[in-house]
């Protein structure tokens, strides 16, 4: 049975929590950010934030906090995970060490429904309210396990719980908000450490009913601030001080999301709310003999940020805004307003979580993932591609460019660019960042340039070579020149040059000429014909190279391909003797050829007119090569170019699917480039544009830098509202998007309001809730049609009050050539637990005028269509507790054909062939089969375990991957070896259990990376998933023969790497559902396996040498170097 290999293609980007303190040194200021299962530590410097380290955490981080005991000069970091593991970390000698660790779970306790709170006393005592009826007090000493005890705490409906700073180490006073039958109250209680019980100190009864957040104010001011939706209250630490209330227009119906202290004295606090407003709360404090007294408060508006979940004042007016729903930001507070705002964004950190839905689309021949991300004003679509990015520095509008050649004339940096058009040549002088069209020496600008370069460089060269279809020109900055033309006047078609040594090879129809450029001691120029050879066929492309493809050494051989014989030859220099003749594996004309060497491996690469590329491993000693390997790099004739980046040579494939080819572990890697089209390219390193590329798409030239490595690239399309579902329609090149728009007091740009055309509709039924229709909500649900390339909203269709778009697909029905969008909606009233009325609406986009959206049909259903799919040209829908199948009639109407009712609530469904996988809110997954002849569903198999499902996906027609609400993944398979149950069903037998640590929201059968043909280890059935934390993960099936091999590697790494939480890897990945626990099985932790690639090689080799090979397939590698190559191949899949 295959094993599931699970790995993160893009790690979590949601900010769980962030803190600022002195972690890496008592004089260092650090920003520490928790994301998913890792913590990033950054150093605050005058140049900005610098990465110090990344701390992997065995668990989903629930919260982090800083603590500094009296004898400590720097802070320690408290980490609590979702499974109630806790650790206290410190940074010593450049490493993260664990000072104390332990499990704080209460085996008999029930987790609180509405509040998890961690608060720290000034002397280091930690209080955690996580379980009903008690507060856990944690004492610790460095190098020991955590010691904790419970204190009884029976107050109902607690909103917040915090230690109060009294200025005394032995006074343990807490403040908390709770509500009972008499209203909401604020209470101060002191903890008696001897009796381990709380004793009431004071109580402020009947505070504002909307009070929910406590902010402790540092001593010497002391006390707490209470935040509500319409008011703020300050309560002093003692019973004698006056309570200070405050309200203003800025507080009207405000829901605060987080707060952060500005001054150590506690006179200023930053506040953020659900509208993304950044507010400053100021305490007006007076000092007297009896201490400090708060006289009044004031709130000022500073500007708008992402909806913040964590806010930290760093220093000098710089603030970090961490967000779960939008991009995190680094902002600066200003003393003077700019456009009504006192803040300016310095840097934005992309966040693609929470992911609500996603769809895989092929655009320009490259797969890309489009996700529904974020919520409310920070809702957006994110376009995600895997490849190498080019960051644009400058661009020049210049159409028709066919060649670009850098020139370094009497300079240590490139100072000219020769640009060839289809009928002429331009010389552009580079002065700083400016380009000027100039005349240079005797360069022929009346004809297109085939090749141009400086010779005998690389620096301070005064000699330029230009090749046109008529002649070769050699020119000196001293004014001397020398021209060479074919004796028979034939047209020069192809040229290749070894510039450092003055070697030129050119093709004129069927003849190859080898030329040598010479400069004598007096500076005179000469071009000598070294050799020529006539072939039987016309030459299509050629290239000069040598051993190592070193541009500083003389070329020793030539490789060329022919037009009509579809053959390739390797020719020895200087006598032009053929040493290798090869028939190419296709009858398409070769258009470009290169002989290169990367990582000491020689390759011959040939690109063909249909966009195919074939490459061979070439043995330069014997003149032989291996079997051809093929890759598609576009749909038009590609051209191959050598480019340099960071002092390393790569190959750039210019096409309508541009690719950069580099090597990893002596294997070629084809990485997509994040531009749509490249006609030609060159490397450039001028004074202003160092180590960059110049590319042309036929309309403009772009100067840009290249990413160091292949990575995920994210493009953001702000929507200004929550985007819930997305579908792609290839026939109209559009996306269909379901969204929810919430009206706000602030000015907002809503995508659904900016459509070219709008329309609206309501269900054609009498409302079941006339009372609710009288007070419609401030939220409107829409279905939008967006252009695939520009993401312009072409049409927005608004649904009725209380009606929410829940699902959408694009598809075709049987006997109908049209492609439709189908949208499922539900009338969701806030006081109803289950939707009673919904509808399925069928839309058609006009092929010509795509802003026209026609409502073809609508069907009222009893419930919410939570998921819809196309099944053999029919529509299958999960509607509350039923699965319904509708056929499409010739009258363009949906007609119910059959139903399945054995569900609580069907949240998701997937289709493969005639099979339907159903994810139920409580009853795990079941497998239905549509019997076409009988016209009904048959429940083929069922998982009898209780799982609270979120989503599912087919692995094969008889195996299913499930994601459930307790952050777990599992796999099940139809077990046909066991007897069928009494009611005629098989059992879906569990084959894998795994704790993911994040909520898997959506799964789809797809991949961003095409599997390399030369991979040692092959995989199948790729499934991508998106989580609430913004992780994009990938699960693939790997053949059973690799199972013990991968498990052994996983165990060896887990045993060798000490995790800061001091728990076993198997404990971390244990599947936990309520009181049930299942050891991890059927999955391999790809993140852990591939972490060895980030280790020092000596450390990695030592770990891999300890891998146990017991029970392995004999054909599998055992040498650590070969095992590492397998892991590198696994990393190439994403």
Swiss-Prot record:
InterPro entries: Beta-prop_RSE1/DDB1/CPSF1_1st, Cleavage/polyA-sp_fac_asu_C, Quinoprotein_ADH-like_sf, RSE1/DDB1/CFT1/CPSF1, WD40/YVTN_repeat-like_dom_sf
GO BP, sorted A to Z: DNA repair; proteasome-mediated ubiquitin-dependent protein catabolic process; protein ubiquitination
Tissues/organs with expression: Expressed at high levels in the spermatheca of adult hermaphrodites.
Transmembrane segments: none
GO molecular function, one term: DNA binding
UniProt pathway: Protein modification; protein ubiquitination
Keyword entries, A-Z: Cell cycle, Cytoplasm, DNA damage, DNA repair, DNA-binding, Nucleus, Ubl conjugation pathway
Location in the cell: Cytoplasm; Nucleus
Keyword DNA repair among record annotations: yes
Any one cellular-component term (Gene Ontology): nucleus
UniProt key word Cytoplasm: yes
Pfam family, one: CPSF_A
Subunit structure: Interacts with cdt-1 and cul-4.
Function statement: Plays a role in DNA repair. May be a component of an E3 ubiquitin-protein ligase which promotes histone ubiquitination in response to UV irradiation. Histone ubiquitination may be important for subsequent DNA repair. Promotes the degradation of the replication licensing factor cdt-1 during S-phase, thereby preventing rereplication of DNA during a single round of cell division.
Family: Belongs to the DDB1 family.
This protein's name: DNA damage-binding protein 1
């Amino acid at each position: 049975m295959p094993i599931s290999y699970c790995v993160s293609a893009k790690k979590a980007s949601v900010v769980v929590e962030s803190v600022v303190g002195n972690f890496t040194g008592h004089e260092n200021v650090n920003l520490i950010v928790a994301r998913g299962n890792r913590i990033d530590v950054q150093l605050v410097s005058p140049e900005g934030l610098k990465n110090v380290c990344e701390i992997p955490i065995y668990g989903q981080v629930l919260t982090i906090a800083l603590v500094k005991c009296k004898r400590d000069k720097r802070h320690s970091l408290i980490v609590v995970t979702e499974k109630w593991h806790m650790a206290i970390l410190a940074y010593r000698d450049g490493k993260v060490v664990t000072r104390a660790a332990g499990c704080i779970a209460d085996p008999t306790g029930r987790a609180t429904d509405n509040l998890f709170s961690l608060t720290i006393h000034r002397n280091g005592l930690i209080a955690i309210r996580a379980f009903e009826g008690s507060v856990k007090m944690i004492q610790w000493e460095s190098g020991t396990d955590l010691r904790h005890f419970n204190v009884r705490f029976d107050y109902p409906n607690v909103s917040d719980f915090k230690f109060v700073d009294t200025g005394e180490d032995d006074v343990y006073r807490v403040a908390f908000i709770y509500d009972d039958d008499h209203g909401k109250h604020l209470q101060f209680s002191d903890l008696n450490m001897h009796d381990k019980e709380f004793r009431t100190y004071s109580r402020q009864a009947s505070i504002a009913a909307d009070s929910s957040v406590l902010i402790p104010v540092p001593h010497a001011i002391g006390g707490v601030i209470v935040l509500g939706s319409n008011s703020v209250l300050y309560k002093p630490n003692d019973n004698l001080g006056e309570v200070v209330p405050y309200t203003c227009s800025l507080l009207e119906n405000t829901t605060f999301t987080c707060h952060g202290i500005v001054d150590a004295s506690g006179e200023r606090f930053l506040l953020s709310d659900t509208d993304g407003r950044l507010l400053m709360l100021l305490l007006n404090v007076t000092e007297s003999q009896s201490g400090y007294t708060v006289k009044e408060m004031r709130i000022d508006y500073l500007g708008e940020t992402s909806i913040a979940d964590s806010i930290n004042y760093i220093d000098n007016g710089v603030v970090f805004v961490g967000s779960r729903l939008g991009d995190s930001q680094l902002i600066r507070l200003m003393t003077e307003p700019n456009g009504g705002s006192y803040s300016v964004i310095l840097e934005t950190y992309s966040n693609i979580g929470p992911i609500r839905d996603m769809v895989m689309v092929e655009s320009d021949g490259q797969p890309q993932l489009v996700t529904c991300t974020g919520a409310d004003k920070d809702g957006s679509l994110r376009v995600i591609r895997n490849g190498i990015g080019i960051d644009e520095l400058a661009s020049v509008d210049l159409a028709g460019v066919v060649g670009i050649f850098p020139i370094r004339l009497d300079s240590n940096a490139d100072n000219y660019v020769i640009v060839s058009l289809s009928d002429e040549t331009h010389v552009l002088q580079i002065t700083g960042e400016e380009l000027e069209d100039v005349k240079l020496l005797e360069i022929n600008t009346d004809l297109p340039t085939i090749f141009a370069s400086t010779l005998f460089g690389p620096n301070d060269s005064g000699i330029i070579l230009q090749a046109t279809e008529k002649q070769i020109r050699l020119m000196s900055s001293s004014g001397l020149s020398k021209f060479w033309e074919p004796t028979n006047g034939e047209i020069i078609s192809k040229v290749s040059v070894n510039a450092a040594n003055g070697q030129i090879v050119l093709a004129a129809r069927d003849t190859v000429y080898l030329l040598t450029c010479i400069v004598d001691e007096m500076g005179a120029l000469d071009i000598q014909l070294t050799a020529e050879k006539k072939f039987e066929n016309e030459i299509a492309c050629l290239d000069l190279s040598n051993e190592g493809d070193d541009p500083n050494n003389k070329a020793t051989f030539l490789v060329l391909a022919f037009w009509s014989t579809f053959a390739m030859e390797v020719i020895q220099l200087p006598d032009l003797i053929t040493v290798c003749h090869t028939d190419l594996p296709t009858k398409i004309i070769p258009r470009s050829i290169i002989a290169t060497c990367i990582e000491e491996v020689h390759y011959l690469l040939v690109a063909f007119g249909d966009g195919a590329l074939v490459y061979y491993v070439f043995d330069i000693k014997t003149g032989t090569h291996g079997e051809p390997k093929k890759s598609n790099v576009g749909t038009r004739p590609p051209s191959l170019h050598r480019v340099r980046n960071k002092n390393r040579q790569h190959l750039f494939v210019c096409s309508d699917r541009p690719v950069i080819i580099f090597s990893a572990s002596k294997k070629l890697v084809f990485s997509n480039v994040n531009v749509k089209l490249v006609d030609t390219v060159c490397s450039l390193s001028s004074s202003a544009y160092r180590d960059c590329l110049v590319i042309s798409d036929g309309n403009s030239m772009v100067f840009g830098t290249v990413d160091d490595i292949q990575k995920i690239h994210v493009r953001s399309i702000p929507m200004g509202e929550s985007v819930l579902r997305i579908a792609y329609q290839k026939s109209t090149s559009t996306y269909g998007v379901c969204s929810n728009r919430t009206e706000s007091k602030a000015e907002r740009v809503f995508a659904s309001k900016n459509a070219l055309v709008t329309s609206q509709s309501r269900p054609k039924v009498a409302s079941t809730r006339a009372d609710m229709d009288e007070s419609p909500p401030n939220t409107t649900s829409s279905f939008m049609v967006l252009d695939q390339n520009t993401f312009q909203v072409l049409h927005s269709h608004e649904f009725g009050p209380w009606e929410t778009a829940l699902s959408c697909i694009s598809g075709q029905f049987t006997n109908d050539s049209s492609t439709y969008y189908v949208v499922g909606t539900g009338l969701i009233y806030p006081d109803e637990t289950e939707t009673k009325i919904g509808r399925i609406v069928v839309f058609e986009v006009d092929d010509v005028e795509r802003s026209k959206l026609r409502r073809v049909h609508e069907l009222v259903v009893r419930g919410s269509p939570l998921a819809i799919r196309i099944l053999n040209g029919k529509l299958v829908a999960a509607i509350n507790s039923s699965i319904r199948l509708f056929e499409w009639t010739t009258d363009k109407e949906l007609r119910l054909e059959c139903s399945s009712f054995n569900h609580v609530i069907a949240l998701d469904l997937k289709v493969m062939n005639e099979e339907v996988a159903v994810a139920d809110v409580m009853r795990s997954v079941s497998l239905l089969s549509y019997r076409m002849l009988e016209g009904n569903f048959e429940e083929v198999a069922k998982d009898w375990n209780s799982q609270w499902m979120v989503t599912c996906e087919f692995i094969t027609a008889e195996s299913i991957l499930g994601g459930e609400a307790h952050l777990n993944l599992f796999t099940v398979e139809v077990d046909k070896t066991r007897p069928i149950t009494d009611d005629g069903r098989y059992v879906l037998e569990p084959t894998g259990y795994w704790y993911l640590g994040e909520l898997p929201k959506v799964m789809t059968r797809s991949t961003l990376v095409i599997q390399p043909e030369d991979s040692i280890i092959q995989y199948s059935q790729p499934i991508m998933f998106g989580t609430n934390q913004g992780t994009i993960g990938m699960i693939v099936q790997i053949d059973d023969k690799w199972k013990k091999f991968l498990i052994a590697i996983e165990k060896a790494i887990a045993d060798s790497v000490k995790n800061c939480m001091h728990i076993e890897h198997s404990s971390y990945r244990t599947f936990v559902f309520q009181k049930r626990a299942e050891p991890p099985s059927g999955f391999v932790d790809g993140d852990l396996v591939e972490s060895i690639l980030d280790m020092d090689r000596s450390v990695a080799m030592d770990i891999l040498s300890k891998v146990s090979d017991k029970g392995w397939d004999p054909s599998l590698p055992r040498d650590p170097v070969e095992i590492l190559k397998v892991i590198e191949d696994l990393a190439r899949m994403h």
